[in-house]
């Protein structure tokens, strides 16, 4: 048997191996809108958009970032961008309120209109599945409130920024604009 025929047989064997199932889509998960009763599928609701996923808190030094996050949402929303907020009490109890209290605070204090979802854990053994997936994709867990993960239109995590990076940071804004230039996937 020649090397060439061995290579051809090896290639044919590989070509007939069934394709391994794709990893679950990052957003193929259900979460309740903040203070809501019915969970929604994030992929059905937000899939195909460029997303900035942020763990939030109402009693944190970074809480004023809500204003900048809302500004991003307003500036780029019509182009297929959304901020997704996930309140968390994981860091020094800085989100102690009920979901109704959080919603009222965000709306009245910062005029938040971007989608906010149920209160979740973003670190530790009770980390919610979305944050497990974000961490697996980047190798980075939130170190504090207002950690930001940027998700492309096709559901890939393409960047993450720590809490100290403000929503209007030039590098973050450039990354959002770069992702918005990519065509939306066919749904």
Give, region by region, the residue ranges found by the protein language model.
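Boundary at the C-terminal end of the N-terminal hydrophobic targeting segment
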Residues: 20-24
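Loop/turn elements at helix/coil->beta-strand transitions in domains of secreted/extracellular proteins
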Residues: 46-51, 78-82, 110-115, 145, ...
């Amino acid at each position: 048997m020649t090397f060439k025929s061995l290579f051809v047989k090896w290639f044919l064997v590989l070509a007939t191996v069934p394709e391994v199932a794709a990893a679950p889509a990052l957003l193929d998960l259900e979460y309740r809108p903040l203070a809501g009763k019915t969970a929604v599928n994030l992929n059905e609701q937000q899939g195909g958009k460029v997303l900035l996923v942020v763990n939030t808190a109402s009693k944190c030094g970074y809480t004023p970032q809500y204003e900048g996050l809302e500004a991003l949402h307003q500036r780029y929303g019509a182009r297929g961008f959304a901020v997704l907020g996930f309140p968390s009490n994981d860091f020094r109890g800085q989100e102690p309120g009920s979901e109704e209290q959080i919603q009222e605070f965000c709306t009245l204090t910062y005029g938040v209109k971007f989608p906010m979802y149920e209160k979740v854990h973003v670190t530790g053994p009770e980390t919610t599945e979305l944050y497990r997936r974000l961490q697996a994709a980047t190798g980075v867990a939130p170190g504090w409130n207002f950690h930001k993960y940027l998700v492309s239109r096709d559901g890939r995590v393409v960047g993450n920024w720590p809490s100290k990076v403000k929503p209007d940071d030039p590098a973050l804004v450039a990354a959002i604009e770069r992702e918005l230039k990519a065509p939306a996937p066919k749904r």
